[in-house]
Amino acid sequence: MNKLIAWIEKGKPFFEKISRNIYLRAIRDGFIAAIPIILFSSIFILITYVPNVFGFTWSKTMEGILMKPYNYTMGIVGLIVAGTTAKSLTDSYNRKLDKTNQINFISTMMAAMSGFLFLAADPIKEGGFLSAFMGTKGLLTAFISAFITVIVYNFFIKRNITIKMPKEVPPNISQVFKDIFPLSAVIIIIYALDLLSRTFIHTNVANAVLKIFEPLFTAADGWIGVTLIFGAFAFFWFVGIHGPSIVEPAIAAITYANLETNLNLIQAGEHADKIITPGTQMFVATMGGTGATLVVPFMFMWLTKSKRNKAIGRASVVPTFFGVNEPILFGAPLVLNPVFFIPFIFAPIVNVWIFKFFVDVLKMNSFSIFLPWTTPGPLGIVMGTGFAFWSFVLAIVLIVVDVMIYYPFLKVYDEQILEEERGNKEVNNELKEKVSANFDTKKADAILATAGANETTTTESAPSDEEVSAKNSSNSINEQTNVLVLCAGGGTSGLLANALNKAAEEYQVPVKAAAGGYGAHMDIMKDYQLIILAPQVASNYEDIKQDTDRLGIKLAKTQGVEYINLTRDGKAALDFVQQQFEK
């Protein structure tokens, strides 16, 4: 098994390179930017259709009123994602351009959204256009429009093919003329694609693309498809790479299209049978975080004998319950630990197999409601499937099965840690024997016991003003310092940000920390003096360094165990911040 892990680690640089691909990153960040709209729209699905489970049905008129906010937000999510994806890709291209000759992201957003309408919207005789492909059905086309837009803009801006205005003209006016050529080229190219599609295929580009990828959508929902997809999530995380950065962009269009399809099936009184949805990923495959680790901290607390394992379990329970499982991933550790390779990969796959059985055989409705990823897994299953009876059973079954999968491997690991603890105890006993040969053992024990009591008292009591002053004097941070901690979604980064803020207040150090998600940081990073990358986004260090160097901001990345230790020791976290400014 150790040889397998070593072989896997050799491929890590290749997978990290894929995870940093600017087009995959743009897709993922584009979706992240649109999540507030998706979450807002899901509220109205809950209000409209959950009462059906309890025998209450809204009238058609009332249903239409309640669903209007959904239709006017989620119904145009393709249009919105075209703009947000273009914005993210523009940021990536701008890193490679001269700082005095940047692509205007507002212009690329508008051009991408306009181009999307050409490719996805059909005109109607009465005026206006149809919106059938402006929602999740048009997501693939949204990516096409965004990519074409930014590539064309980059071609023009990089070569200075623009209308140049005199220096006396205000910058905002000059920017308008600078964008005319690339914007015009984008619209002409996309309009040409639209004309070709309607002339030779007799349909819009969005529908044509959907037809091409339809077999892939169907295959992805099959047994082999779900095995490969959700196995990949866990595999990449196991080798220390943020799996969603690679897998999510590849399946994003499928998951959100399936979510809307399931809702449409429920509205029509039919069985919602699409398996791959955001809910399947967040609450079934990664229940409690990647690796289906919801049960693992509880098992560490209650089913192990090692003091170390019990302590790790207690420290990891709360964050893992809300899907933030880095404390157990790196604290145990689970990632790159040969003992946990099989359960970490296998548990998510088995969870999805069981879920698929419930949907295909027991006819439970699949997910039709989008919920925040921090929703506890069992609650997410119940709410996301509309409070169906089988969803309660499914949640219990998954918990039991995950315990059964992890248990034998946990016992093996616990024995390993116990052996280490026994070894340390033997070393301590040997040292004590050497001491007794030269000193009065009782007297030495009394001294050690007194020292231990004093240490305990010092640890448990609040620091005095003198102690605070002494500790503060050792820290060279005298001016207000803002620290931004970045992770993939904002949950893990909150652990370190909270630890820093608490320690800064306790030791009276002028440090303020905030948590953020990588990809949503570009517009706010200028307000910080230091950016810390959590382990899950540490592979992006070289990319973001181009931005921090330009702005004169310090940048630091962390490793798994190091990061978890910093979240648990506020003073060490402050020292880490200070060290970055001493380099």
UniProtKB/Swiss-Prot annotation:
Q: Which GO terms describe its molecular function?
A: kinase activity; protein-N(PI)-phosphohistidine-lactose phosphotransferase system transporter activity
Q: Name one GO cellular component term.
A: plasma membrane
Q: Where is the PTS EIIC type-3 domain?
A: 8-409
Taxonomic superkingdom: Bacteria
Which membrane topology describes this protein?
Answer: Multi-pass membrane protein
Report residue spans for region: Disordered.
453-475
Key word Acetylation present: no
User: What is this protein called in UniProt?
Assistant: PTS system lactose-specific EIICB component
Which source organism does the UniProt entry give?
Answer: Staphylococcus haemolyticus (strain JCSC1435)
Could you tell me the gene encoding this protein? lacE
